[in-house]
Structures are given as structure tokens and as C-alpha cells.
Amino acid sequence: MQSNTLSLKIKLFRDKKSSEINYLYKKKDPSERPMVLDVLLQAQEESVDDLSFRYGCRARNCGVCTVDINGKPRLACRARAKDNDVISPLATLPVVKDLIVKRDNISRQLIGFNNIASKNNLNVEADKTYHNLTACIECYACLDGCPLHKKNKPVEKDNNNAYPFGNPFSFLKLQRLYIDPLTPEEEKLGIIEKAKSLGLETYRRDYKNLKIKCGVGINLKEEVIKPLLNAAYGDQIEKKNK
Ligand code: FES
């Protein structure tokens, strides 16, 4: 028989202290299969009225609702809640409050590297890979398991320059610029140098834990990391393999 409730744990972080609540989600009817975001919204309405979390589109478009569910990053608006699920903030970024993490330091890595945005004509002639990369919703789930992002320890909330090392998201943005037909040839060298300065080389030895496909279906190894490694170190790799 289907139950009318789901029992979940929500981990909260406030004032540098962590705590957790056991929350019993009340289904609207026994057949309901709520998303984790539905659970958070009900918990906020009925139990913890200042529970903090982010959401926007509720349709896998904006990427801001990402939380860890049982230790793995998921979009809360798209993940079905199950009995005994544990919901916590993304482990890869510093917590601001409850389930809200500080996101802006990641994009700060790329300040000054989108000089061509004003010339954008939507690139209807660009190849398929370019358009695949525009599908990134910036959910930051790809930080999980990244050997480079792990080096950014300690993750400091108040230091805007706390992330000297890159991650699949940053490299995706650089690769998209690199293959953008509007990027002048003379700027491509700067893009590769930026990728190198963020530690791209680490992936030559260690990217086995990197997610292959992200949540919106971008193949991070084939469409982002491999082509960047090829552009940055293609000669050396070929020589090594001879
Ligand atoms: S709320 Fe926009 S992706 Fe989940």
C-alpha cells in the first residue's frame, strides 16, 4: 500500500553551526511523487518558516536550485524525493545559510574573458558543439569530483579570489569562447593561456573522476576537456605518444 508521507532529513547550516531536521512530507494523494523542491517548499511553509534555499524556473532551466541529495549534486526541481533522502547544501561551495551556497566566486574566474558578447549574433552558423555548450544552465553540479576544484581548499566564503583552480564549468565557458566563430584568432591564444593558468594541465593526468555527462547532457570530457587539452598541449601529447 502506498504511504501518504515521506520521511527525509534536511541539513541546515547557520552561524557556522550545523543541525538537521527530520521532516515528514505530506503527500497530496498517495500516488504523488514529489520533487525535492516540493519537500523544501512544504517544509518552509509548515515547519521551518525561515528555511533558506534557492529556486527559480522549476523546469531545469536556471540551475540555481542545485543541492546535494544523499551526497550527490542534483537539481531540486527535477529530483524525485524518496524516503530517507538526506538533503544538504552543495559540498563543493561555501554555505551562506541553510541550503544556499556562495556561487559568484566561480564566475569571477572568468572576468574579462567574454569580450565578444556585444558582437553576438546567436551564431546560427556555428557548429553543433558550440550550441551544445550554450545549453549549460550553470547549476555547478559538475564541480563534484573535480580534482582541480578540490585544490581550492580551504573554500573561503568571504574571499572573492579564493579559487585559483578551475573546474568543468569554467573550462566549458572558455571552450565555448574558443570555438565561437566570432572570436578573433588573436584572442584564442589568451583563452588557452587562461585555461592553462586555471590548471588545465591537471586533467592530462587526472580526470577519471570527472563527470562524463552533465545534467543537461553536455559531454564534459569529449566536448570540453579533450578539445581544450588538444589546443593547449596537442604537440606535447603527440610527441609523448610517438
Ligand atoms: S529551479 Fe531552475 S533549474 Fe531548478
Give, region by region, the residue ranges found by the protein language model:
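Iron-sulfur-associated redox domains of electron-transfer enzymes in respiratory
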Residues: 2-103, 143, 147, 152-155, ...
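Ferredoxin-type iron-sulfur electron-transfer modules in oxidoreductases and energy-metabolism complexes
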Residues: 34-46, 90-91, 95-242
